[in-house]
Curated annotation (Swiss-Prot):
Subcellular location, record wording: Cell membrane
The keyword Lipid biosynthesis appears for this protein: no
Gene Ontology biological process terms from the UniProt entry: cell wall organization; peptidoglycan biosynthetic process; regulation of cell shape; response to antibiotic
Superkingdom per UniProt: Bacteria
Catalytic activity as recorded in UniProt: di-trans,octa-cis-undecaprenyl diphosphate + H2O = di-trans,octa-cis-undecaprenyl phosphate + phosphate + H(+)
Matches recorded under InterPro entries: UppP
Gene Ontology terms for molecular function: undecaprenyl-diphosphatase activity
Encoding gene (name): uppP
First-tier enzyme category under EC: hydrolase
Note: Bacitracin is thought to be involved in the inhibition of peptidoglycan synthesis by sequestering undecaprenyl diphosphate, thereby reducing the pool of lipid carrier available.
Listed name of the protein: Undecaprenyl-diphosphatase
């Protein structure tokens, strides 16, 4: 029944809206949840759905940060306009590694890593990394506390860390936040740049998935269009809350709790995979 599919779409939209911005892997969570709750749709649609619903989350970022990201915003001084264009240039530079590496390798990673065990391992590995990095940085003051002071070189290397998220379970936001902190930025700068970098990255990735879906000869029926719209709208609404939460959270806390969450979840998934394989 369509109503059941739409309820599932709402649920998946909630998962996407929360996990897209927290460093816990949205795609990984969607794949995991769909192990137990699946849309009654073909595999090609589900694979496209898992990526394209990110558009709702991206529109939320654009709405929240519209004035900050808009170089044509009335009232901005010449210096503020210049800084806005410089920010966009940093974002473009940070996209280069993904264009050169992640895009060509996407199909291979999708074929070999989009199942439970690699996701669980990635969750654990990056969970340990978050805890270790936070302990190392506990007594250190960040070198970059303002996006305006972040160099183009740093932006490029943050983009290199983003490439790591091609492995499901890694988390795009987790990889870029972790990379930015390692490179000397404050948590606030790391989170903000992660949000901004997501706009072209996820728009591009969603667009590629949609184009590939249609070029492969697939099409969308009315129910599938509705499912995508409902899931994306839900992701948009939930993302508004999740982004506000994370921006407030990083002002007072570190990311250790997310590292612990990843380790616990990854361990449970490995146990589940073991028993599923044995029995």
């Amino acid at each position: 029944m369509l109503i059941i599919e739409l309820l599932k779409a709402i649920f998946f939209g909630i998962i996407e809206g929360i996990t897209e911005w927290l460093p816990v892997s949205s795609t990984g969570h969607l794949i995991l949840v769909q192990e137990f709750i699946r849309l009654n749709q073909d595999k090609a649609f589900i694979e496209m759905f898992n990526i394209v619903i990110q558009l709702g989350a991206i529109i939320a970022v654009m709405l929240i940060y519209f004035e900050r990201l808009n170089p044509f915003q009335p009232g901005k001084t010449a210096r503020e306009v210049q800084l806005t264009w410089q920010l966009w240039l940093k974002v473009v530079i940070a996209c280069i590694p993904s264009i050169l590496i992640a895009v060509p390798l996407d199909n291979w990673f999708e074929a070999h890593f989009y199942f439970m065990v690699p996701i669980a391992i990635a969750l654990i590995v990056y969970g340990i990394a978050f805890i270790w990095i936070e302990k190392q940085n506990a007594q250190q003051e960040p070198a970059v506390t303002d996006l305006a002071r972040m160099s183009y070189k740093t932006a490029f290397f943050i983009g290199c860390f983003q490439v790591l998220s091609i492995v499901p379970g890694t988390s795009r936001s987790g990889a870029t936040i972790l990379g930015a902190i390692i490179l000397g930025t404050s948590r606030t700068v790391a989170a903000d740049f992660t949000f901004f970098l997501a706009i072209p990255t996820m728009f591009g990735y969603s667009g590629l998935k949609a184009v590939k879906f249609f070029l492969d000869g697939h099409h969308l029926d009315f129910a599938q269009v509705l499912i995508l719209l409902v899931a994306s709208l839900t992701a948009f609404v939930v993302s508004l809350l999740a982004i506000r939460f994370l921006t407030d959270y990083v002002k007072k806390h570190d990311f250790t709790i997310f590292g612990k969450y990843r380790i616990v979840l990854g361990s449970l998934l490995l146990i589940y995979s073991f028993f599923k394989f044995v029995f």
